[in-house]
Amino acid sequence: MAAKDVKFGNDARVKMLAGVNVLADAVKVTLGPKGRNVVLDKSFGAPTITKDGVSVAREIELEDKFENMGAQMVKEVASKANDAAGDGTTTATVLAQAIVNEGLKAVAAGMNPMDLKRGIDKAVAAVVTELKALSKPCETSKEIEQVGTISANSDSIVGQLIAQAMEKVGKEGVITVEDGTGLEDELDVVEGMQFDRGYLSPYFINKPETATVELDSPFILLVDKKISNIRELLPVLEAVAKAGKPLLIIAEDVEGEALATLVVNTMRGIVKVAAVKAPGFGDRRKAMLQDIAILTAGTVISEEIGMELEKATLEDLGQAKRVVINKDNTTIIDGIGDEAQIKGRVAQIRQQIEESTSDYDKEKLQERVAKLAGGVAVIKVGAATEVEMKEKKDRVEDALHATRAAVEEGIVAGGGVALIRAASKAAASLQGDNEEQNVGIKLALRAMESPLRQIVANAGEEASVVASAVKNGEGNFGYNAGTEQYGDMIAMGILDPTKVTRSALQFAASIAGLMITTEAMVTELPKDDKLDAAAAMGGMGGMGGMM
């Protein structure tokens, strides 16, 4: 086992604080509308330019192992805030730095760290309660746009795209971010349920100009097995032909004579048919077939539940207003499924999301919810260079997470104002069990001014003057660093999602509390490469007699 280096008490805390400050100082320059960029060197390719706090934090690794421990703990704050709310990483880092700096000063002055931590925890709990009271729901498209704009570092076009996407696919819909092909940002919306399976034969195409199959008011046959024998399909085909409507077959596969017969019938115009493979694999395929069945008011023909394809009737078939199929995707628009059943299915999948421990499974389940609940929107990010594309894509993803958080828990005044108002309301009733807890409460409440001070400092203004003016104001009164004006933050469109502000504060206080109560630090001693080399050479002394 390698030898260890141990530091105690003040020696340990000084080293840890140095690491905290290096990381936080690099991250906090990105905060606010006038935050600066940070350039990150990559081992290959062009450097990355970013204003995303968590991206900066992830890159930092310090040479001194004790300092690095401090830096890694603050990195954890940024990562946790990012995982919980998708934004607020810089705010969380600034708060953690402020609480640690104030807390360690108090410890150095002889205060009991455990009582300080209890005081900090009391202050944070009270402020979180006040934040929830200050929060107002984020419902209008304008508010969603404002939240998106702020989170994308005041890029109003991104805010507009996100608001439009949410309007089109609903609050539950899937919105993804992809690389665009031009210089402009674009929004691409797929309404209805889309899955990644195309037509099984190009002979089904009835719109040659777009190379797609379009079926109006089709019946939809859902089969949980391979179809290779046409005899199994004949009763359904005859019934559909009599009804005079097109038919979409979704099965595990359609092959051999069954596929050939369908193609011939389609080309002769006897019955309009298209066949696609069912989406997914294994159990997920069964679940997705069931989703389509509920969406289209059909039944999955499955031998597992004793149903046979030959005995299927028109009542077993689903229906939709329109189906569009290209070589890669199938889109079912306006299925006739019962609204209550669809909502029940969505609730059931949501329950599975809650219980799932795998991120991959959660993502796939979330996609299923979106396909049932609304649709899919793709924001295509345009940029002149690859470096700009990466930076912009990061910002768009941040903005998307922030708007989801705003819809979930509501919004509060931005620009650090909500924390100051919540802190001043909480201060009136907060009382610790002893004087040292009171010190913890006061230092935590004082640290809550730090995001506002940092935003102002990054804008090149005097932080103390602005902080004093904002503290003397009421309600949503604050300072807009972008325009350098005072006023009502919500009226000016400077909003923060409550969840982002709350998560940033809770994670910052949690890690900061652990740091303040640290009394010893242990790390491996660095290996001396010279000694290792000498030891290796020493083993060769007996070679002199070989001549």
Curated annotation (Swiss-Prot):
Chief localisation class: cytoplasm
Binding site for ATP: T30, L31, G32, P33, K51, D87, G88, T89, T90, T91, G415, D496
Subcellular compartments: Cytoplasm
Chemical reaction(s) catalysed: ATP + H2O + a folded polypeptide = ADP + phosphate + an unfolded polypeptide
Alphabetical keyword list: ATP-binding, Chaperone, Cytoplasm, Isomerase, Nucleotide-binding
Enzyme class of the recorded protein, top EC level: isomerase
GO cellular component, one term: cytoplasm
Any Pfam family hit: Cpn60_TCP1
Molecular function per GO: ATP binding; ATP-dependent protein folding chaperone; isomerase activity; unfolded protein binding
Function of the molecule: Together with its co-chaperonin GroES, plays an essential role in assisting protein folding. The GroEL-GroES system forms a nano-cage that allows encapsulation of the non-native substrate proteins and provides a physical environment optimized to promote and accelerate protein folding.
PANTHER family assigned: 60 KDA HEAT SHOCK PROTEIN, MITOCHONDRIAL
Description of how the protein assembles with itself and partners: Forms a cylinder of 14 subunits composed of two heptameric rings stacked back-to-back. Interacts with the co-chaperonin GroES.
Family: Belongs to the chaperonin (HSP60) family.
Protein name: Chaperonin GroEL
